[in-house]
Design a protein with these regions (language model features):
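C-terminal transmembrane-helix exit sites in multi-pass transporters
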Residues: 6-28, 148-167
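Hydrophobic residues within alpha-helical transmembrane segments
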Residues: 2, 6, 28-32, 54, ...
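Hydrophobic transmembrane alpha-helices of multi-pass small-molecule transport proteins
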Residues: 22-42, 89-92, 153, 165-184
């Protein structure tokens, strides 16, 4: 919840700073989607330690910055590949630090590589492809669909139970997203340079 809250806060502030509009309908949709996320994730959750909470907030701000930067990108595939190359040394260094605390086998390593290099990379390329056509506020709200998709995947592939709470939470999120995306933010008029 801290992670999504940080992403929303940063990207909405960025959107408003850049001149995007936040009408009553869009604001209501944003609040409804966040309420749905809270209802989906909060029950049963415990307050994390301060350090863990700060790390989640930092991760949310980093993802917001990543998304904002992606709006100016031209080649989604090349940008994602470059980001993965730059992130690999950091990931390896962190893995070495925590190596003694984990358990490793061939299947786990292979699944991790498939998850990161295939599934995540494909999702990032798709996200970077869509971002240039989205405003910051719209993009931040669309990201709230991820927990709903993860929940659906758990039901379909892992036989997890589907409760009334999760159904209504997902409906609240999706309704909020529709409210935000249905009303398009007006583009800012471009000022023409005056001739001398």
């Amino acid at each position: 919840l801290l992670l999504f809250g940080a992403v929303q806060f940063a990207m909405v502030i960025h959107g408003l700073f850049k001149g995007e509009s936040l009408s009553a309908m869009r604001a209501g949709g944003l609040v409804l989607a966040l309420t749905g996320i809270a209802a989906l994730l909060l029950p049963g959750a415990k307050a994390p330690p301060l350090y863990s909470a700060l790390m989640m907030i930092v991760a949310g701000l980093a993802w917001a910055a990543y998304s904002v930067r992606g709006r100016a990108g031209q080649a989604a595939g090349a940008s994602t590949a470059a980001n993965f190359v730059l992130a690999t040394p950091m990931a390896l260094a962190l893995s070495l630090l925590f190596m003694k605390q984990g358990h490793y086998d061939a299947a786990g390593i292979a699944l991790s590589l498939l998850s990161g290099a295939a599934a995540s990379a494909g999702a990032y390329v798709l996200w970077y492809t869509l971002l240039p056509s989205l405003g910051s506020i719209t993009a931040s709200t669309l990201q709230l669909s991820v927990p709903c998709l993860a929940m659906l995947g758990g039901v379909v592939f892992l036989d997890e139970s589907l409760t009334v709470r999760t159904i209504f939470s997902a409906l609240a999120v999706l309704t909020g997203i529709v409210m935000v995306t249905r009303e398009k933010s007006p583009r800012q008029p471009m000022t023409k340079a005056r001739k001398p």
